[in-house]
Amino acid sequence: MISYGENLGGRAVSPLPVRGGHMMHGAAFAYVPSPQVLHRIPGTSAYGFPSVGPMALPEHGCPYGEVVEHHDPLPAKLALEDERKPEPGLIQKLRRAGVTLLKVPLMLSFLYLFVCSLDVLSSAFQLAGGKVAGDIFKDNAILSNPVAGLVVGILVTVLVQSSSTSTSIVVSMVSSGLLEVSSAIPIIMGSNIGTSVTNTIVALMQAGDRTDFRRAFAGATVHDCFNWLSVLVLLPLEAATGYLHHITRLVVASFNIRGGRDAPDLLKIITEPFTKLIIQLDKSVITSLASGDESLRNHSLIRVWCYPNPTEVPTPMPRAEANTSRMLRNATLEKCNHIFVDTGLPDLAVGLILLAGSLALLCTCLILLVKMLNSLLKGQVAKVIQKVINTDFPTPFTWATGYFAMVVGASMTFVVQSSSVFTSAITPLIGLGVISIERAYPLTLGSNIGTTTTAILAALASPREKLSSAFQIALCHFFFNISGILLWYPVPCTRLPIRMAKALGKRTAKYRWFAVLYLLLCFLLLPSMVFGLSMAGWRAMVGVGAPFGALLAFVVLVSALQHRSPGCLPKWLQTWDFLPLWVHSLKPLDHLITRATLCCARPEPRSPPLPTRVFLEELPPATPSPRLAMPHHHDATRL
């Protein structure tokens, strides 16, 4: 009996029908299993065994025992469904069609509950930290510092889980004269960073499968990387030149802007009937505290009294246990109809309850959504959807594909009125491999643009005497995102967020606890540390920040040279092996965390060490793809 490799005309080439130029070689793969026994081999679900491409590629020193994987967003577990199967009968076809038709409304229901859970999660964070956010905004001396303003924008948006809420607070403070436009611009930049924490949390729910987790986390953090890189360039530029302030002032002065209606709540029309039964908040309390109005200090954020006419604006009132309706300023107030209207619990307790419940609902809906999508997107269906989403325009207009994706992302975000909802909704699709990270990047950039249109429309609803300043700060948000796109998208070599996100995804797939560390570090610990240094004065900021920044720049430069041109470096600097292991590797920390978390667990039998996975997009430029080649003594086993 001949081996599979000889049957295919090559050496140890797997027959599985997975797309892409994947290769495997080495002694560990001397025997290639057939598809019928593949599912019985432990750990094979994470591997795709594609065939070698038709082009003959030269050797490039690929050591034995490595798996070289070319980028292909369609995962192996979906592509395996394309195997030849016997033709099903009529009854089986009808049964499959019925099950599919039943899955579609179920999937839409889970998607609806997923979006509602994001809304309730935002309310929970506002109950737990909304007053703290209002107090942070109150100190104008702090906000006059650009770095402190940036950190305030990050922390407040993380606390309230809504960039729309934090931006509306800033707009109201600017329009009331409590905050200058120049001081509000760094806060807007910070809110742009803080809003990306939601889809990063959503990506954590796919940590069960390392391959899916790698893609999902990379797709979520590409938003973070873009925002952080944009701030690192544009915040010093704005502090030195004030270009955003000057451009937006010219735009406002050039147009005869008139006040209009409020921003349309297209998605809330669908979600509010459900979320209003759970909780209703009086967000004017946060805005009043930020404006310095201490009369509402002891007022609860939980709304108890509501106007039956939705066009009327309710007046903040303390909780009351009296009648179900009362008269105030010739208007009838009725008790609101939600779960926590008469509980008497403090805001913090209600916020923690809602936080736990919304996270549980979010996790459940996301897991069920992923399973539904996995069952629906099989074989040819997955290939068609993947091809439609990830295929570029014809050759003369290939460059326009990404910009069209930006328009789609902006339009969808305008419809759902939330960039967090849109990016969180596409994160599971990125994890499944239906949307590639290269396509998710322009979609995310378009989402950044779409969320600014909501702020612009909200500013147009301001009173005439406050319209100019409110519209100017909303335009600052818009031009900040446009500037970031001009920096990090038009030229392919400047698309650093994609490479950074892929590196983060690869790291988190290897050490899954790193995702939690990343969240704490980027959205809590690092902003808090920078905020403390900025409050200590510019001398402390420069004294600590300058050496740290120089060290970081040196490490980034040397790492890039080690990857691209190691010959340019001294021999001792071509690797970081001269440093202690804990300085340049996460293995010691991973060992400690593993021992701490599994000390009471029953040890499982360890499988043989898996081969190293090398991704072609991480090889230096102009590097030919390693082709399958073995010495004669490593030939495939004959059965």
Curated annotation (Swiss-Prot):
Disulfide bonds: 225-522, 306-336
Example GO molecular function: sodium:phosphate symporter activity
Reaction catalysis annotation: 3 Na(+)(out) + phosphate(out) = 3 Na(+)(in) + phosphate(in)
GO terms under biological process: intracellular phosphate ion homeostasis; phosphate ion homeostasis; phosphate ion transport; sodium-dependent phosphate transport
Localization per record: Apical cell membrane; Cell membrane
List of glycosylated residues: 298, 323, 330
Cytoplasmic compartment spans: 1-103, 164-165, 371-412, 488-513, 562-639
Record keywords, A-Z: Cell membrane, Disulfide bond, Glycoprotein, Ion transport, Membrane, Phosphoprotein, Sodium, Sodium transport, Symport, Transmembrane, Transmembrane helix, Transport
Transmembrane segments: 104-125, 146-163, 166-185, 348-370, 413-436, 467-487, 514-534, 540-561
Sites bearing Phosphothreonine, chain numbering: 508, 623
Membrane topology (UniProt): Multi-pass membrane protein
GO cellular component, one term: vesicle
Cell membrane recorded as keyword: yes
Main location: membrane
List of residues that carry Phosphoserine: 14, 34, 607, 625
Extracellular side: 126-145, 186-347, 437-466, 535-539
Functional note: Involved in actively transporting phosphate into cells via Na(+) cotransport in the renal brush border membrane. The cotransport has a Na(+):Pi stoichiometry of 3:1 and is electrogenic.
Protein family: Belongs to the SLC34A transporter family.
Subunit architecture: Interacts via its C-terminal region with NHERF4. Interacts with NHERF1. Interacts with TMEM174; regulates SLC34A1 internalization by PTH and FGF23.
Protein name: Sodium-dependent phosphate transport protein 2A
Originating species: Ovis aries
Top-level taxonomy: Eukaryota, Metazoa, Chordata, Craniata, Vertebrata
